[in-house]
């Protein structure tokens, strides 16, 4: 992505502790790629540095990432994305954390303890501000997860966020390339049909209850083929193949798909 000129790398799979080094390597490859391009294009590509933005869910993870980037690479983030417990898909929270926040139920509109995670957002912003001061630059903090309407956006701004990231609300739009059956699942879903489920990746995830999840409730779904997509994956023990489930979603085969979505779908 960096080699071909990506503007920003947003990284959320675990702790991206070596991301600055990967950017450096990517920049070198980009310069080599554009060496024979017209001088004007080459200069522009050579000078532009891809921005990096880690996704975090706690002040602790933000502190670890930014401290190690500072110590090991003498650099910091260009932006930080906070993914909250109401987000869709894989979540950066343990099941215990979700339970403590009241975010593991099918009625999160009644059980979610927003004020607890609001404090976490404020703490993350404080961590980021330390590196803003050290590097003398603005590091925007973006809040994601459960952003549904104007009130949610305004609330994020009041907490000190510079912006919000919205995913679920745009899935059903004409511009989204998801298959129609996937969009209809979002439109028809009721709050009590959105639930936390298990993932072979070792993280809890939020998805729409469907035939696939009901089969999973009865036991593991046999894996037909291994794609080597996860470094630590034993096809005999995992509950299902995450790749097959997501491919089915992309194809619109909703009865055999993992339909990830946010709490406010």
Regions found by a protein language model. Name each.
Residues 15-16, 147-149:
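Gly/Ser/Thr-rich loops at beta-strand to alpha-helix junctions
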Residues 77, 87-142, 148-265:
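Conserved active-site-proximal phosphate/metal-binding subdomains
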Residues 1-134:
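Active-site entrance/lid segments in N-terminal catalytic domains of soluble metabolic enzymes
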């Amino acid at each position: 992505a960096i080699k071909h000129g990506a503007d920003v790398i947003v990284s959320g799979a675990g702790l991206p502790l070596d991301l600055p080094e990967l950017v450096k390597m990517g920049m070198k490859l980009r310069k080599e790629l554009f060496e024979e391009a017209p001088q004007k294009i080459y200069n522009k590509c050579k000078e532009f540095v891809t921005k990096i933005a880690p996704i975090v869910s706690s002040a602790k993870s933000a502190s670890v990432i930014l401290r190690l980037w500072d110590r090991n690479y003498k650099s910091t983030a260009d932006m930080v994305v906070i993914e909250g417990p109401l987000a869709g898909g894989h979540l950066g929270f343990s099941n215990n954390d979700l339970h403590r926040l009241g975010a593991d139920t099918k009625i999160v509109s009644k059980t979610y303890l927003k004020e607890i995670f609001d404090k976490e957002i404020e703490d993350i912003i404080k961590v980021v501000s330390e590196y803003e001061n050290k590097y003398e630059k603005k590091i925007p903090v973006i809040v994601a997860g459960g952003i549904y309407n104007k009130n949610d956006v305004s609330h994020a701004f009041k907490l000190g966020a510079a912006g919000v990231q919205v995913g679920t609300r745009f899935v059903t739009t004409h511009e989204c390339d998801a298959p129609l059956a996937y969009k209809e699942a979002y439109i028809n879903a009721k709050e009590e049909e959105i639930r936390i489920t298990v993932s072979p990746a070792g993280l809890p995830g939020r998805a729409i209850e469907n035939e696939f999840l009901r089969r999973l409730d009865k036991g593991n779904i046999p894996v037909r083929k291994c794609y080597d997509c996860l470094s630590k994956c034993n096809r005999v023990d995992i509950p299902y193949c995450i790749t097959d489930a997501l491919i089915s979603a992309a194809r619109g085969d909703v009865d055999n798909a993992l339909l990830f979505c946010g709490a406010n779908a």
